[in-house]
Regions:
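Positively charged n-region of N-terminal signal peptides that target proteins for export
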Residues: 1-5
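C-terminal motif of bacterial Sec signal peptides marking the signal peptidase cleavage site
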Residues: 15-18
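Short boundary/loop segments of OB/S1/cold-shock single-stranded nucleic-acid-binding domains
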Residues: 21-40
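Structural detector for short beta-strands of small beta-barrel domains
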Residues: 34-57, 61
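Solvent-exposed coil/turn segments that connect beta secondary-structure elements
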Residues: 60-62, 96-98
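A short macromolecule-binding patch
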Residues: 63-78
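Short nucleic-acid-contacting surface segments enriched for D/E, G, S/T with interspersed K/R
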Residues: 79-94
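OB-fold/S1-family single-stranded nucleic acid-binding modules
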Residues: 97-134
Length: 137
């Protein structure tokens, strides 16, 4: 029984250590991708659904970057301030069209409505990189 307990503890520690290494590798890839301004694209779309920082946008241009994604996509707005959007609004947004894991929402790091900037690129990018450093390291 004692050997079994030691084996279970060993396997649990090994599993947890493996998860930590996996997160560190993911964080490194995310930081590399999100740090390079060349990976960002600015798109235009229509707000379909909005809840706090989560937004679903209809964007036909997204298919040019993600062939497997349909024109409706989930995004997360990386703003420290509440951004008010209305369903049906036409918005211009900057994102990195790349999914790192299943369920990952594409980041919005810049947001404009009629040339009115609601989230600047610099602020949004900084918030996104901070989020990666906090959640994946």
């Amino acid at each position: 029984m004692k050997k079994f307990t030691i084996l279970v503890i060993f396997l649990l520690v090994t599993f947890l250590f493996g998860c930590n290494i996996s997160n560190q590798k993911l964080a490194k890839k995310m930081i590399e991708k999100y740090s390079d301004n060349r990976n960002y694209v600015t798109l235009t779309g229509e707000v379909i659904e909005f809840n706090e920082n989560n937004v679903i946008i209809k964007c036909e241009e997204l298919n040019d970057y993600l062939s497997y994604e349909d024109e409706l996509c989930d995004y997360y707005i990386y703003s420290d301030q509440f951004v008010e959007l209305q369903v049906g609004e036409e918005i211009q947004f900057t994102t990195v069209p790349f999914h790192f894991y299943n369920g990952h929402k594409l980041p919005i790091v810049e947001l404009k409505i009629d040339e009115n900037t609601l989230l600047s690129f610099e602020e949004g990018k900084e918030n996104l990189l901070d989020w990666v450093n906090i959640n994946f390291k």
